[in-house]
Amino acid sequence: MNITVKDLLDAGVHFGHQLRRWNPKSKPYVFDNRHGISIIDLEKTYDLLENASKAIEEIISQGKQVLLVGTKRQAEEPIRELAAATNMPFCVNRWMGGTLTNFETVSTSLAKYKSFLRMEEDGSLDKMHGKEVAAIKRQMSRMQRNFEGLLNLQGIPGALFVIDSHNEAIAVAEANRLKIPVIALVDSNSDPSVLSHPIPGNDDS
């Protein structure tokens, strides 16, 4: 792993949330409080990051995908960049309830969106009547927000990688229900006990 504790320090990963937002379950990863801010223990962050990296490598070596999830504004760019670098599916818009627990229905809708995209590419959409085209375009616009990052999703993922497990509580709950491992950046306002591989750190840095 080509990251050092100093790298984490320089990135501000040690800055947690204000004490009034502190989740007591994050206590094992907080070593101090300064000026009303929780300070995260970067030695523990480093060790858990290393463990999480190994877990991801193992999942990928089995031919499984890792679904990258980060729907808050600060998470969108890093999630998109990570998805582009790894060719993994991602979600940066609103998490659709049932993405995992109602995967069959979601897969059907995703297949429909893919068929619309093919029609647009091969020109068959242009051969349809105006009202039909307008209706399909409206559907595509709605679907684009939900499915743009899932076009290469091959099935139920082998794991979730999440930025801000507190914000993505629904996605985490669905994964836990299906016993899908969750690797997540967890700030001092979050509950690390619901995660397979918590990585304590500033989820806004």
Label every model-predicted segment.
Residues 1-65, 71-120, 130-135, 153:
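N-terminal cationic and glycine-rich segments that engage phosphates or anionic surfaces
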Residues 63-64, 87-88, 155-158, 178-181, ...:
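Short glycine-/polar-rich loops that comprise or flank the Walker A/P-loop
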Residues 72-75, 95-100, 165-168, 188-192, ...:
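Conserved nucleotide-binding/hydrolysis micro-motifs of P-loop NTPases
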Residues 77-84, 170-178:
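Short Gly/Thr/Asp-enriched flexible loops that form oxyanion-binding sites at enzyme active sites
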Residues 117-159:
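Active-site rim loops that border cofactor/substrate pockets in soluble metabolic enzymes
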Residues 158-173:
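Internal active-site segments that recognize and position negatively charged phosphoryl groups
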Residues 171-173, 178-205:
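Short glycine/threonine-rich loop/turn motifs
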